[in-house]
């Protein structure tokens, strides 16, 4: 159970809406309740949904940070689906696409076909588990714990591939939001929470990438003190507990 909680560090630190937060909390509760009561097959289903949510949040970050690349990833979809994804206002809109298909967006962060094939196997496991086929694939805690270890390896791998996206997202945030006079929120903490974390669904792991960002890249910016102030506020307010 303790290892399984590691996934929380890859999910959004906080949410823009209470509905989204309640949904993720519901999935965690479903996982924990079924795990505790030995219903490991159902615990796996809830954990898989949390994992797919993580993938949706990563794809959302691509959409927000590299919209041109995201648009290229839409090639091959039907016009209606393409428009739906292009106009998406929430990462959960990606759930309208077949899970195996949505994984192809991970090519945009340099995940090759071999890796995506491995990730797709997790979707196949979910499909086998969710259908009434007379089989209990996860009948023991050991079996589920082994699968959780495998899932977390995949999550960490995807997170590593996402690093350039997070760095680009944060760099742009610092450049565009360093002036309290012409940004969305005059207070640094509010700007970070609402515009950086909520709009991009940043996780604790993402925030760690931001904290390690070298702000000296922007030392020639006319408002470098404002950039330093934003960065220091992030590091102070979101230091890993």
Label each PLM-derived region with a short phrase.
Residues 18, 105-172:
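Charge-enriched, short contiguous segments at helix-coil
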Residues 1-103, 121, 160-182, 221-240:
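Amphipathic alpha-helical interface elements
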Residues 29, 69, 87, 112, ...:
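Acidic-enriched, low-complexity/disordered segments with a strong bias for Aspartate over Glutamate
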Residues 126-135, 194-202, 232-241:
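Short flexible/disordered coil segments
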Residues 97-101, 109-112, 137-141, 196-209:
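General structural signal for secondary-structure boundaries
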Residues 173-232:
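Acidic, Ser/Thr-rich low-complexity intrinsically disordered segments
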